[in-house]
Structure formats: C-alpha cells, structure tokens
Amino acid sequence: MPHKDNLLESPVGKSVTATIAYHSGPALPTSPIAGVTTLQDCTQQAVAVTDIRPSVSSFTLDGNGFQVVKHTSAVGSPPYDHSSWTDPVVRKEVYDPEIIELAKSLTGAKKVMILLASSRNVPFKEPELAPPYPMPGKSSSGSKEREAIPANELPTTRAKGFQKGEEEGPVRKPHKDWGPSGAWNTLRNWSQELIDEAGDIIKAGDEAAKLPGGRAKNYQGRRWALYTTWRPLKTVKRDPMAYVDYWTADEEDGVSFWRNPPGVHGTFESDVLLTKANPKHKWYWISDQTPDEVLLMKIMDTESEKDGSEIAGGVHHCSFHLPGTEKEEVRESIETKFIAFW
C-alpha cells in the first residue's frame, strides 16, 4: 500500500478542472473495452488536474509512477509518413525496437518484451451496454471457456486498433491496465516466449503465494514490472491523458473487472482495475503534449510491493475532456505495453 511521506510538492503549472468518471458499480459491461469506457455506474467528480510543466523532469517512474521523456522516433520522419504509424511491418521492425531501447535506458532492465500495441484515432464514444448486473468475480466472468490455442500461434506482441473496423478512442474511465492477480496470470499464460523467460519468476511467485501474506510479502525472485507508453501522433489539443501520483492512491481504490484473454493453456483470468473515488488523489497532466514527448506509466512493479519500499507502483489514469476543445482535431496516439525484467 502506498505510504511514502515525502511527497513532491506540486510544481507551478496550469491547473484545470476535469470531470472524472470514478467507478461506483456494480455493473457487468459487455466487453473489456466497455468495462473501461462505460460511464454507467460511475460517480462524476470535478477534480483539479495539475500541469507538470515547467517541472516535467521532477516526475519519474520510480518516484511517482509516471514520467514524460523526450524521444524522437524514426517513424516521424521521411521516408515514413503519417500512415506508417499504423503499418504493422513498420511498427514491428522500427517502432517496437525503439521502445525496447528506450525502456531499457530508462529503467535499467536487462530484458524488455512488448506485449500489446494499440492505436487510438477516433473520438470518444460510450459503448452500448447490457442492463446492470453485479460485478463479475473470478469464477463468474461470463466468458465461455475456449480451447487452448497452440503456443506457436500466440505471439508475445499482440496488436489492436490498427485495422479498419477495430478503431478505438480515448478511455474516459480511470483504471489500471492490470491488477496484481491478472499481472501474474498474464506472466504464466500470455505466450510461450514469456513463460520461458519468466520460469524462475513464476516458481518464486508460486512459493511466495503459499506463505502467510502471499506474494506481496514474500516474493524473493527477480524484479519485474509492467509499463505502458503513450505517444501522441500530433500535438494534443483535446482528450489529454491524466494520471494519479502513486503515493496519493490506496490499494483499495481499484476494483477488479475480470476478463478472459486467450493464453497458451486456454483462456485465463486477467483483470482491469477500475478506479474508485478517493479525495487524496492528486491528478496530473502535461499540456500540449507533442509527438516527441512520450508518456510512460507503471502498471505494476514487484519492487514497489515490498514492505517499506519507496519505489512507486502502478498508477490510475484516463483521458479527460477539456472544455472548449470539441472542434479540435481528433486525438491520435500509439500505446505500447511492455514487461521489463531485471
């Protein structure tokens, strides 16, 4: 649970008022996308969101759970053009390796593997929902069990939003992309390549889980962490990202919405943490974010779970509406979720 006492003072920057759609449940969304975008069963609260300019460098991944860094991608210059950002070959051969090197240089990790690449290039639209039902638990997620997909058919890097008809827009509901249980289940199920890399970690985690206090108290294996990067494809004028300083949130602020993605052993239980309101939350954003300003956010970090740790863990985040920007160009972005090993 976050407990750091020496919180960084808010920098001098613009503070805007945003309406945050905190989860207040219960509801059973019709899909994982609906789970993190529906405004049904939400408590709308006005919050202050502080601009990290001009003190961008004061906020770091280990210090706050998020960081904005300068990084120029080759995809932003000739011979590439705007369409190259959604070209799967360019992404795989040019952009993904750039993110891996950036991740290693920032975190000091020895190994980085990209799990998911996403493109967002349409306006926010709330999905259609079924009537409200109790929030699903692990054993009642409503998804039908599927046969195991052959290991060699499940790539470590999956992609969404790049093909016509699967476009996605901003996510207005605050969340974390994985909860602790879902993160560990992802480690042991996502792809054979990931399982092979993390074999010793999985074993150490299983041993720790058997002891009083579970993995969070007893894990002694290699450090590993999940992150997401967010790069706008043009200067952000609408629907910017907002993120909560890790130390101002409580463990109880996240409510698991369970989902069943495909894995090498069949479908497995994973979760998104939907964010409940907490008056302690301190929200931040960066104004007029440009394509060479990459936002990185932690999703989870085993180092942060140790007793007395001063290493930040995963942060709640979402996009938010800036009044008066309705006629601005639609926000476009590329997201990359990756796992790091030390």
From Swiss-Prot:
- State the source organism's domain of life: Eukaryota
Associated pathway: Plant hormone biosynthesis; gibberellin biosynthesis
The EC number(s) given in the record are 1.3.-.-
Gene that encodes it: DES
A single MF term (Gene Ontology): oxidoreductase activity
Q: Which organism is it from?
A: Gibberella fujikuroi (strain CBS 195.34 / IMI 58289 / NRRL A-6831)
Q: Matching NCBIfam families, A to Z?
A: CmcJ_NvfI_EfuI (NF041278)
According to its UniProt record, which protein family does this protein belong to?
Belongs to the asaB hydroxylase/desaturase family.
Protein name from the UniProt record: Gibberellin cluster GA4 desaturase
